[in-house]
Amino acid sequence: MATGLLIGCSEDDFEKSIFGLEETGLDKNSYTYALDAYLEDNFLKSYNVQFIYRMEDLGTDMQKDLVPATYEQSKQLAVLCKYMWYDIYKELAGEKDVFLKKYSPRIIHLTGTPGFNSDGTETLGYATNGTKITLQAVNRLDYNLIEGHYGLNNMFFHTMHHEFTHILDQTISHPQAFNVISTGLYNSDWNSTPDEIAVGNGFVTSYASANNTEDWAETVSNYITKNQADWDEMLDIASYDWEQVDFKDDEERDSLTSLYTKALVYPASYNTDSIGRSFRLGSGEYKWVRKSIVRDQVTGKPVKDEDGKIQYLHNKAIDAIAVINQKVDLAREWLKENYQIDLDLLRKTVQERQYMTDENGNLITKTDGNGKITYVNRLTQPDPQNPEQTLMDSLLKTIDAYAVEK
């Protein structure tokens, strides 16, 4: 089953407060007291935010089969929300604490499983009326992974920044100049558009191609959370033209040696950079996504260069890299002018909290077996303040400190 990150967004109607700050009367004999007290101090009292980890049926999509988040996974996400989201904006925003009290969502709601959709995708998070963010699939949380489909960025942090951007955008609208950059390219059927084709059209993701509002939120959130290697890889994809084509006839499709079968069964064994990859449409049908190549106008056959190599088309119609950079520039100016937030400093701070840095403050990189640049996860490394434990252990102990001796 194909999976994809879906972020549901509805029209925002921001309210400064939707519940009071009266004493909650926590049960000190409860097994969950430590987490409950931590959430009360660090979210409810600090920012008027209810952090709900005990799944509430009425607060979820009743058409989906969902289970609650586990206590341990809820603890992990709670400290990560504070460390990777709230503490950063508190440090960088011009109004410090006041900024978050004004613009933070009023409810953060967790579910253990994602929302499984009929088209084969999974909903990992969504926002409701600008006051509530639901983070799903919490039981998959693995703080050992930052990048990748099941990494913290894709599963959680991207959603947080995406929805928070919507709240800021609804308070002070993003510039109209942004809306006309990709006029005519927005696509209501974005879920059937591969990321490569969307990126080649000047969008950071296929979801960004849904409309200018999602384009704005996706541009900001991806710029913040993507590390430099992944951002550069996306821009490289943007430098090419891409095409989506049908597989060949059913006879080839059914063959165990066909490209179709190889792509579905052994996708990691083939160089998708040169031959492309399969993509599942919302209808369940598979298409082939590949770079567009230079072809003979008469025969349709590939035209090779003097070294006998296939030639690829580069931005025949759209300078996608320039388009993406233009969108980021507008976001950079808007955040600085309206919220006194330096987008590049925000990105740098987020990534320095995610990854290890050297003595000069540069992110430490390494290369995996496939030649891909990777970064060292700071959460799993020794805490500089207490080298005998990892940073994640130290964060979790801030919850344990609330435990009552019995």
Residue ranges and their predicted role:
Residues 4-8:
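C-terminal motif of bacterial Sec signal peptides marking the signal peptidase cleavage site
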Residues 10-94, 98, 283, 314-317, ...:
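Acidic/polar, low-complexity intrinsically disordered N-terminal segments immediately downstream
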Residues 14, 75-133:
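Auxiliary, metal-adjacent structural segments of Zn-dependent hydrolase domains
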Residues 63-71, 143-151, 155, 202-210, ...:
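Second-shell loop/turn segments in exported
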Residues 135, 147-175, 217:
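Active-site recognition of the HExxH zinc-binding catalytic motif
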Residues 179-229:
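Post-HExxH zinc-binding segment in Zn-dependent metallohydrolases
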Residues 186-192, 236-320, 356-383:
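Surface-exposed intrinsically disordered loops and tails
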